[in-house]
């Protein structure tokens, strides 16, 4: 009789014991020297995983009793990394982070281990974001990782308006010529306008003028001067005085300026590249006058006072929420004829005009507030049913593709007003909740730290309004809460609230702001409002119509301006500020 027995995980058992022997310096027959550190290992193990070691053994005709010594330059691989590599060779396990991925790639290159290179490639793909895409592109070019290079390049192209801004330019000025030229040549480059592209080129050249002046002539050809404002053209002309062999470029600039003096003024928008960004307010979903739920997505182009339809949502809903992050708009929740609180979540790609289904929210929500902070999408508060409020703050984890509970507000509320400060803090200001059995807005400010998941500061103040307030930071530590009946300045440092005489005028249709309106701050103390319910003071609350107009409030003057009317009058639509690429205008 014959029986075969197989040990479970025997290979792992053997390698674990060999690794213990390595660390105890037992039975070693090779050593790796890095700086003043010596690491002992077994030739057979490393020869099995590294073609480099196998080649050294065979080319030197090493005998069984011979010992192999390898000296590694510490400027190429650190002792810490060599120790990590040896652990990986013996166990097949490695922990990759943004801090060690470059050295691990060097190790994979040095020892010629393609499996480790694949792991590093996968890590870079999964962890890429706006903050690291420039560094990742450098790594991809250095180690010839095409997939990473393509994704990182797209990240830089889609966020060029950030990298060319004062906030991001400190790192971007070190961009290699081959990458910088490729970006300027890209028609889909996401610049604020062609002025930013020309200014970025000049600043990039002057950052290392002696080395980069030779690239100016070639890169200048990628700029459409007809799309550049007179002010920036004059700025560029003055800068060219400090460069050699730029007389022809100066002549081109002067020619454009001269032509403009002789022709009728026209919008520069028609000359912008396809990727140039338009500040826009995007309206999604809502309920129509006869009760039908809407799935339309409309954009108001601020610069042109123009409405256009972008797309149709994958579902019809009102009281949903939306926020933008880069080229994407995220939507979630809402109510329909059948379901009062939807869990569904979607992402709209403004560049490709396409929708992607996201994992559902953990609970169905209406009147929640979506917001983007530090490039991450959050959902704040909301209702799961009439008079049932939640305090949950959810975060969407792009890498794991899941909604996570990030923390909780101090009070369960819906219809909250939220403003961000920096890349870390959310200020959640007032909201609706049950007070002594009645739905009421409460005077509370929660400072939520997205890094720790805690409400690090909670301030309460007497509230005399039940309308949705407008928020702004007039000074670094002064949060302004403006409403129709009462306005408050909250000193976050002194934890003190003070009433002010400034108030928000009611809408031109004599209605106050509430959760049914689409409200969006668009910068420069201006606030966009459209849709919502219109009620008159001399009729019962049940008699209402839907506001068919759009308005713009200048908070500096306290006056409303009537804008171009939206395509449809909608109650409780979602609303967010977004930067749309110019190419969408070609759809009109």
From Swiss-Prot:
<feature type="domain" description="BTB">
    <location>
        <begin position="12"/>
        <end position="124"/>
    </location>
</feature>
<dbReference type="InterPro" id="IPR015915">
    <property type="entry name" value="Kelch-typ_b-propeller"/>
</dbReference>
<feature type="modified residue" description="Phosphoserine">
    <location>
        <position position="149"/>
    </location>
</feature>
<dbReference type="Pfam" id="PF07707">
    <property type="entry name" value="BACK"/>
</dbReference>
<feature type="repeat" description="Kelch 4">
    <location>
        <begin position="425"/>
        <end position="475"/>
    </location>
</feature>
<keyword id="KW-0744">Spermatogenesis</keyword>
<dbReference type="GO" id="GO:0031463">
    <property type="term" value="C:Cul3-RING ubiquitin ligase complex"/>
</dbReference>
<feature type="repeat" description="Kelch 3">
    <location>
        <begin position="377"/>
        <end position="423"/>
    </location>
</feature>
<dbReference type="InterPro" id="IPR011705">
    <property type="entry name" value="BACK"/>
</dbReference>
<dbReference type="GO" id="GO:0030154">
    <property type="term" value="P:cell differentiation"/>
</dbReference>
<dbReference type="Pfam" id="PF01344">
    <property type="entry name" value="Kelch_1"/>
</dbReference>
<dbReference type="GO" id="GO:0033150">
    <property type="term" value="C:cytoskeletal calyx"/>
</dbReference>
<keyword id="KW-0217">Developmental protein</keyword>
<keyword id="KW-0963">Cytoplasm</keyword>
<keyword id="KW-0597">Phosphoprotein</keyword>
<feature type="repeat" description="Kelch 6">
    <location>
        <begin position="526"/>
        <end position="580"/>
    </location>
</feature>
<keyword id="KW-0677">Repeat</keyword>
<feature type="repeat" description="Kelch 1">
    <location>
        <begin position="280"/>
        <end position="327"/>
    </location>
</feature>
<comment type="subunit">
    <text>Interacts with CYLC1; the interaction may be relevant for proper acrosome attachment to the nuclear envelope.</text>
</comment>
<keyword id="KW-0221">Differentiation</keyword>
<feature type="domain" description="BACK">
    <location>
        <begin position="133"/>
        <end position="235"/>
    </location>
</feature>
<feature type="repeat" description="Kelch 5">
    <location>
        <begin position="476"/>
        <end position="525"/>
    </location>
</feature>
<keyword id="KW-0880">Kelch repeat</keyword>
<dbReference type="Pfam" id="PF13964">
    <property type="entry name" value="Kelch_6"/>
</dbReference>
<dbReference type="GO" id="GO:0005634">
    <property type="term" value="C:nucleus"/>
</dbReference>
<dbReference type="InterPro" id="IPR000210">
    <property type="entry name" value="BTB/POZ_dom"/>
</dbReference>
<comment type="function">
    <text>Required for both nuclear and acrosomal shaping during spermiogenesis.</text>
</comment>
<dbReference type="InterPro" id="IPR048070">
    <property type="entry name" value="Calicin_BTB_POZ"/>
</dbReference>
<protein>
    <recommendedName>
        <fullName>Calicin</fullName>
    </recommendedName>
</protein>
<dbReference type="InterPro" id="IPR017096">
    <property type="entry name" value="BTB-kelch_protein"/>
</dbReference>
<dbReference type="GO" id="GO:0043161">
    <property type="term" value="P:proteasome-mediated ubiquitin-dependent protein catabolic process"/>
</dbReference>
<dbReference type="InterPro" id="IPR006652">
    <property type="entry name" value="Kelch_1"/>
</dbReference>
<dbReference type="Pfam" id="PF00651">
    <property type="entry name" value="BTB"/>
</dbReference>
<dbReference type="GO" id="GO:0007283">
    <property type="term" value="P:spermatogenesis"/>
</dbReference>
<feature type="repeat" description="Kelch 2">
    <location>
        <begin position="328"/>
        <end position="375"/>
    </location>
</feature>
<dbReference type="GO" id="GO:1990756">
    <property type="term" value="F:ubiquitin-like ligase-substrate adaptor activity"/>
</dbReference>
<dbReference type="InterPro" id="IPR011333">
    <property type="entry name" value="SKP1/BTB/POZ_sf"/>
</dbReference>
<keyword id="KW-0225">Disease variant</keyword>
<dbReference type="GO" id="GO:0005737">
    <property type="term" value="C:cytoplasm"/>
</dbReference>
<keyword id="KW-0206">Cytoskeleton</keyword>
